[in-house]
Amino acid sequence: MREDFKVNDLENAFKKATKIVSETARTKIVEKTDSFIHAEAKTKWRRYTDDLLLKAIPEKGIIQVRSESRVGIGDNGVNQKRVDDFAYRLMTE
């Protein structure tokens, strides 16, 4: 699942995105630069590890968010929900 989020102030939005990811339950940042975050998110059920990737793209003024399962074919909507929850927090907090 991948979505792009247009933001007005990319630098501050990416700082906010970093805070959101670091505060998300069962999620740990494993790599971070000024424009990229790779986090591992554990699912509630069975504790599978999923990848959560965020990338700031200055040329487009967007934060690209991708959540994907490492194991299995279906995810019961977990990755979509993770991206939706992130988007809600990014736009409302």
Please give the residue ranges for each predicted region.
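Ser/Thr-rich, low-complexity intrinsically disordered terminal regions
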Residues: 1-93
